[in-house]
Amino acid sequence: GMGTKISAIRPVIMPGIALSTAGVLMTAFITGGFIWLLSGMEWTNIHFAFLPSLLLAATMSSTDSASVFGILGSQKVAMRNNLRPLLELESGSNDPMAYMLTIILIETITMGSELSGWSVIWQLSLQFGIGGLMGVAMGKTTSRLIAFYHTWGNAKGAGEDPSQATAMISIMILGAVFLTFSATTALAGNGYLAVYICGILLGNERLPNYRGISKFMDGMTWLMQIVVFLMLGLLVNPHEMLDVAAVSLLIGVFMIAIGRPLSVFLSLAPFRGITLRSKLWVSWVGLRGAVPIIFSTYPVVENVQGAGQIFNIVFFVTLLSLLIQGTTVICSARKLDLIDTDAAPEEDFGVELADDLPTSLHTIELSERELTKGNTLREMSLPKGSLVMMVKRGGRYMVPNGTLKLVPGDRLLVIQEDVTPDSRHA
């Protein structure tokens, strides 16, 4: 959530919400119907009724587009048509829907009741409503507490040590995350949605020492991922996975080739501004990650019949998705001509501005077009109020002057006045 900028997702907020709600529902029902048709066939060795089939599909209905961002970031690739913020919004907001579907289906199966449409709508509305309100409330409250601490610390002289302030604010945010999730869950809301909204609000505030806080959160993210995959690895039995390998392969191929594309095209049908190529690529990069595997442990905890097979199938499908889709992200985007070759990839110069300065940092990659009037800074047409602080050429960093000869491919670190706080770091 903290990495999601409101200014970036605003143009794609409606398509993103459609993918994370209607898209998840359609993926679950389409794939669940296919699993139900496979059940009972002698060679599949799975025997699921309709609701358990739907439960299996629901656990796999959310995507892990963070893996896509990692691949794009490592290759320094920029996407056209606002595809990056669209996937960012979808991946951040579709886990709550998949979680609610999983919980509702588990409760229905264990209680032996019928699945009521009105009951599902009521529970979804309740969890979304409480989760959204708690996320906004906790985000605003945490932001004000951080601002109060920063003001009080500066007044007392405690704010003179940036590392101390960064540590305290990071701990405050971490505590707010746990409090937000637990309080929302206690109120019968969706804790995942509340934490995501809280993170969005905090990430769009002008937090002091933002770079240090971001690094702390990245470290915590990696730590949590290591713990999660270690625990999941302890639950896996390779022999049991082999027993369901054939049917898992069929389910995975169906979800990749039919289930996900069909749900994406239906969800995005009202939005005529999204091109066919964009829809095809969004359909292809619906990677499954750790979240579906975690959701598949819920039926095991609740002793749902066939829970062991559900876990093994989800684990197999996730590995298949990462193997097939994860290795073809870049080449599929290139085939569909969705890579923006004109955009300069983000470059981290390791420079951060003070929070009270009404300025921001930008990175510009030079091409022949920018050097048509000359190859020095004094001959370039820079925006008013801009100043070049540093030039990167290959692996060298240079402090520029008016006579430095620039060449295509140079990266300029530019400081500019009067901009929004969304791009204060470079």
What function would you assign to each model-found segment?
Residues T341-I364:
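Long, charged amphipathic helices and adjacent flexible linkers at domain junctions
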Residues G3-P15, I146-M172, V177-I251, F271-L280, ...:
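Membrane-interface junctions of multi-pass transporters
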Residues A66-Q75, M79-E88, A98-I109, Y196-G199, ...:
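Re-entrant/interfacial helical elements at transmembrane boundaries that shape
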Residues I9-P11, P15-Q75, T142-L145, P238-F316, ...:
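Transmembrane alpha-helices that form the ion-translocation and gating core
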Residues E368-R424:
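Cytosolic Rossmann-like ligand/nucleotide-binding regulatory domains
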Residues G1, M26, I30, F34-L38, ...:
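Alpha-helical membrane-inserting segments
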Residues A18, A22, M26, I30-T31, ...:
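Hydrophobic faces of alpha-helical transmembrane segments in multi-pass integral membrane proteins
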Residues M79-E90, N94-L101, W118-S119, R211-K215, ...:
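Membrane-interface alpha-helices at helix entry/exit sites of multi-pass transporters
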